[in-house]
Structures are given as structure tokens and as C-alpha cells.
């Protein structure tokens, strides 16, 4: 009857649509259902042998007891022979061995089932993420997306391997044990259930109170994690402004609040657990006393008396753990539901069944009356029209939020237009496959992105089969070869995911070399020189001028000195093009561009 299990799962989250989620989860099992079927068969055999062992031992004890009484009455010498004792002992050992075998088998199969299902869902998530529009990622926190593919799936896997498996074993053991206990003696069984019910009610009442403190503990944990993350990511700025003490004080205060919330939660748990154990002890004493009286009166045999205690222990522990198991499964279902919510997100429009082909893009681009909004009710861009000839340099300028980057996203079909047409060499971009369209572009973004790998691998990201000579040539054209050769391992230098071993300007040079290697028909430079110093900017500008010759190039920049030679300048404001023309013409018109230019060079 005693159980040292912590009775409180303080982090319980319930699924919003439990029945729907369960049915879909069953459908998700697919080819893995046979493993679960075998698990159920193993659980049935495990439960059978677990329940039958005490019953068999009861018969053996009663047989020995009766032979002892007969020997005492007849005055004969009583002796347990090895043949008699060994046979029954061997039978019990076989039962225990069978329990162990079926327990190990069901645990192995359930773990295999959980990991296979985990792998299947993780694959579905990975494929889904590639089919989601950028607008989905814009409105989601990166951590929330990562949580679906990692934490939620791990919680599901853990619940299957522990919570679900233990629940099935517990139900079988409880039903089997209680049935035989009731068969032995209904009154003693009622006494056992009475004390078990009291301990369950006490655990439930305490858990409800604990949840309130647990919620506060979770909030404090989140606050502390955020402060630590801020202190790490902003450590240089904190030191630069001498705010170490203030940052440390905030972290200390959050740590104190977390400790206080945790202490109160743990106090309740540590106070109630001994109380529940006391209740269980009283139950054991009551069963022992009443059972002893019944034994003396001949209403209960010694074998059944000792077997009753075995069944009480077998049933008592899983009964008190049922709440924990159910809470664990509820949390897992909530995690599975969040995974399904991701899998049900609206996807990008599929590529045409028979897409058009551009074997050799030239770079002629036409925007005709383009309209766009993240939702139909909210239009962000309207009536955008302009034409770009092959090999021209187009500059896009405007204040933050004017729509410069959005315009490029529409060109590359990162977002779908709501109206109008975008033509590339006279072909509607929607008639092309996305992969085919994007092969025509090379991008250098404002935020450099380098992955964990060698410098050579990072440069060759867009052309994995590039030779070392091609990689070096691209690096030289981007003015990156010199600094690469100063590194200890040169092109084989391994960069971390944050590439902190090289400067921001050097990271920018590597991304430019990456684009140069791809040799695209159209270039997109989004603030390409915004994170480098003046000298590096001059080197990059010379390299880019060479690269842009004969190529259509879109340049987004706040520093107008980099785009005075553009063939066409688009001035954007609030999602519309308010001016377009070359530098000279726009200055002469005295409009928004002239005002912006004069403000930078006054």
C-alpha cells in the first residue's frame, strides 16, 4: 500500500480537443501499429504472471501449513523435501522470469514505437516548414517553432515510453489484484480501498494547491532565463555602459523570486507526502489487524493472508500513481496537439504541375499593378509598377517600413502577390517553379548567415560541387582571399554557428563571395555594405561593380552614395512608389529623393 512516488505533476497542460487529437494520433501510427499490438500482448502476459504469482504462493503456503498441522496432530516428523519445495520454488521462479521477460520486451517495443513515431513526425514537421510561407515565420517566435520539433516531440516520446506503458500495466495489475483480493475477502478489500481513497483525495487536494505555486514558479523561471539570455547576448553593451551591477541585480532578484516560489511548492509536496504515507501505514495496520483476527477465527488461511498483502502492495502503488500517469498523458496530448497545429498551418501555393522553364535567364523584370497584403483585409502595397531592362542597376530607397524588402520578397516569391503580374523575361513568375525562379537570383542580405562548417563550405553553399579553384576565385573577387589566408587553416578554418572568430565585415565578404560563386543572372543586395567599415565598403563596391556588369541588380541601401550610378531609383513610402528615375532626374525634381539626399550630404 505504500508508495514513495511524488504525487504531483506540477506542469500539466491539457489538449483543447482531446478526443480529436487522440483519434488523429492513432491514425498517425500507420505502419507502427503492429508494435503497439505486440506491446499490448506483452502487457497482458506480464499482468497475468504478476497477478498469478501471489495466488500460486498462497496455495503453496496453505499446502505446507496443512501438512504441518497434520504432522502435529499425528505426531509425525514434518520435513519439507527438496523435491516438494524445489518444484514449487522453481515454478515461482519461472513466473518471475516470465514477468521480467515480458516487461523487458514490452519496454523495448514501446521505446522503439515511440522513437519511430517521433522520427516520422519530425520528418513531417521538417517537410512542412519548407512548405510554409514566410508570413508564418514572421508572426512566430523562433523558440516556439523549435519547441514543436524538439520539446513537444520529446515529451510525446517520453509519455509513450513511461506514462502510457505504466498506465496500461497499472490498469491490468489493479483490476487483477483487486479481483483476487475481493475473492479472498470482500471486507478486507473494502478496508484497503477506504484508506486508498483517503490518500488519493489528500493527494488531489494538495496537487490543486501546488499547481498555483507551480504556475508562479514557471513564470519566474521564464523571467530568469530571459534575463540570463539578455545578459549573455548583450554582454558587450552592458560592459560598455558599465551596467554590470544593474544586470546582476536583476538576475539575483529573479533568482530570489524563483527560489521563493520553488520553496513554497516543494514545502507543500514535502509536507503532504509523509502525510499520505502515514495514511497508507494506517491502512496496512488495519488490514493486518483485521486479517489477523480473521486468520485466528479460521475465516482466512495463512497463504491467502500473506497473498492479500502482496496484492495490496501490487495494487496500492499503481492506484496512487494513476493521477501522475494521467497528468503526464494529458501534457503529452497537449504537445501532440501543438505539433498538429503546426502541420495544419496553411501552406504556400503549390508549384504548377507543368512549370515554365527559363534555361538562361537574362534579367528583364516587369512589375505590373502589383497589390499585396498579409491578409486580404490589410493591403500593404498597391499599384506597384515599373520595368527593368536586362543588365540595369535598380536602387530601392525609403524609410524603414516603406516596403523595400517586401518588394524583393515578392520578386522571389517568398510571398505571393494579391494582384497584378510579375514577369521575368516575359514569363509570369507564378508559372515557374520556385526552385527554377530562385536559381536566377543571388542574394546578399543585411544579416549575414554562416553555418557551422569551413570557410570553403560556406562560400560553396549555393554551389556544393564547386572546385577549390572556383571557391578561391570567388573569394578573391569579393576581396576576401587576403583575410582568409591570414587565418590558421585558411579556407579550411571551421566557423562556429555565430562565426565570432571573424569580424562583421569579414562575414559580409564571405556572403558576397558565396553569391559571386553562384554567378546568378540577377543580384539582390539588401544593405550589402551596411555592416562594414568605409575602407572595406570601397573594396566591396569595386568588386560589386565588376560583378554587376551585364547583370540586373537590385540594391537596397540607406546610404545614397552607393547608388548614385543606378539606372533606376525607386523611392518608396508606405508601400507605394512615390518617385522613380535616375539620380540626376530625381535631384532635379526636388522631391522626396532630393530631400533625403540633401539631408545626408548637407
Regions found by a protein language model. Give the residues of each.
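A short amphipathic helical element positioned immediately N-terminal to and/or at the very start
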Residues: 18-33, 145
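Transmembrane helices of ABC transporter permease
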Residues: 31, 35-48, 162-216, 287-300, ...
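Helix-loop-helix
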Residues: 180-194, 268-337, 342-343
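An intracellular "coupling" helix at the cytosolic face of ABC transporter transmembrane type-1 domains
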Residues: 31, 134-135, 151-160, 164, ...
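ABC-type nucleotide-binding domain
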Residues: 78, 351-352, 358-602
Amino acid at each position: 500500500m505504500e508508495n514513495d512516488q511524488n504525487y504531483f505533476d506540477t506542469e500539466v497542460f491539457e489538449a483543447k480537443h482531446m478526443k480529436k487529437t487522440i483519434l488523429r494520433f492513432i491514425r498517425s501510427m500507420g505502419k507502427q501499429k503492429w508494435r503497439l499490438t505486440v506491446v499490448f500482448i506483452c502487457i497482458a502476459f506480464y499482468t497475468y504472471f504478476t497477478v498469478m504469482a501471489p495466488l500460486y504462493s498462497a496455495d503453496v503456503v496453505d499446502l505446507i501449513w496443512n501438512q504441518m498441522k497434520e504432522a502435529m496432530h499425528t505426531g509425525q516428523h514434518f520435513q519439507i523435501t527438496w523435491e516438494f519445495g524445489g518444484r514449487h520454488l522453481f515454478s515461482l521462479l519461472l513466473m518471475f522470469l516470465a514477468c521480467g521477460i515480458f516487461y523487458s520486451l514490452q519496454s523495448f517495443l514501446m521505446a522503439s514505437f515511440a522513437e519511430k513515431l517521433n522520427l516520422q513526425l519530425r520528418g513531417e514537421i521538417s517537410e512542412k516548414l519548407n512548405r510554409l510561407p514566410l508570413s508564418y515565420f514572421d508572426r512566430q517566435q523562433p523558440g516556439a517553432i523549435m519547441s514543436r520539433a524538439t520539446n513537444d516531440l520529446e515529451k510525446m516520446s517520453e509519455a509513450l515510453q513511461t506514462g502510457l506503458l505504466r498506465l496500461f500495466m497499472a490498469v491490468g495489475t489493479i483490476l487483477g489484484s483487486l479481483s483476487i483480493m475481493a475473492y479472498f475477502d470482500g471486507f478486507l478489500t473494502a478496508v484497503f480501498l477506504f484508506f486508498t481513497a483517503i490518500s488519493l483525495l489528500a493527494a488531489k487536494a494538495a496537487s490543486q494547491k501546488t499547481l498555483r505555486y507551480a504556475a508562479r514558479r514557471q513564470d519566474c523561471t521564464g523571467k530568469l532565463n530571459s534575463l540570463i539570455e539578455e545578459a549573455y547576448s548583450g554582454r558587450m553593451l552592458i560592459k560598455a555602459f558599465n551596467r554590470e551591477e544593474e544586470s546582476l541585480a536583476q538576475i539575483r532578484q529573479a533568482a530570489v523570486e524563483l527560489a521563493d516560489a520553488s520553496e513554497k511548492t516543494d514545502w507543500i509536496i514535502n509536507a503532504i507526502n509523509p502525510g499520505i504515507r502515514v495514511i497508507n501505514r494506517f491502512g496496512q495496520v488495519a488490514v493486518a489487524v483485521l486479517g489477523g483476527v480473521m486468520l485466528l477465527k479460521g475465516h482466512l488461511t495463512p497463504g491467502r493472508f500473506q497473498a492479500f498483502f502482496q496484492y495490496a502492495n501490487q495494487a496500492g502503488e499503481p492506484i496512487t500513481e494513476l493521477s501522475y500517469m494521467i497528468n503526464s498523458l494529458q501534457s503529452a496530448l497537449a504537445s501532440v496537439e501543438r505539433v498538429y497545429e503546426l502541420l495544419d498551418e496553411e501552406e504556400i501555393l503549390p508549384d504548377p504541375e507543368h512549370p515554365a522553364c527559363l534555361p538562361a535567364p537574362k534579367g528583364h523584370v516587369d512589375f505590373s499593378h502589383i497589390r499585396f497584403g498579409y491578409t486580404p483585409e490589410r493591403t500593404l502595397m498597391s499599384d506597384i509598377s515599373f520595368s527593368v531592362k536586362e543588365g540595369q542597376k535598380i536602387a530601392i530607397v525609403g524609410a524603414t517600413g516603406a516596403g523595400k524588402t517586401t518588394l524583393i520578397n515578392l520578386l522571389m516569391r517568398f510571398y505571393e502577390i494579391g494582384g497584378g503580374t510579375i514577369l521575368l523575361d516575359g514569363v509570369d513568375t507564378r508559372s515557374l517553379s520556385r526552385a527554377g525562379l530562385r536559381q536566377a537570383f543571388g542574394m546578399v542580405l543585411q544579416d549575414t548567415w554562416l553555418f557551422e562548417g569551413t570557410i570553403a563550405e560556406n562560400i560553396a553553399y549555393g554551389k556544393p560541387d564547386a572546385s577549390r579553384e572556383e571557391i578561391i576565385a570567388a573569394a578573391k573577387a569579393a576581396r576576401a582571399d587576403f583575410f582568409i589566408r591570414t587565418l590558421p587553416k585558411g579556407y579550411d578554418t571551421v566557423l562556429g554557428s555565430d562565426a565570432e572568430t571573424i569580424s562583421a565585415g569579414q562575414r559580409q565578404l564571405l556572403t558576397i563571395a558565396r553569391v559571386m560563386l553562384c554567378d546568378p543572372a540577377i543580384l539582390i543586395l539588401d544593405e550589402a555594405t551596411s555592416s562594414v567599415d568605409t575602407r572595406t565598403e570601397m573594396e566591396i563596391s569595386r568588386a560589386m561593380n565588376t560583378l554587376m556588369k551585364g547583370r540586373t541588380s537590385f540594391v537596397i541601401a540607406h546610404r545614397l552614395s552607393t547608388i548614385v550610378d543606378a539606372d533606376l531609383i525607386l523611392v518608396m513610402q508606405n508601400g507605394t512608389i512615390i518617385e522613380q528615375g535616375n539620380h540626376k532626374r530625381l535631384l532635379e525634381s526636388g522631391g522626396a529623393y532630393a530631400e533625403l539626399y540633401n539631408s545626408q550630404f548637407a
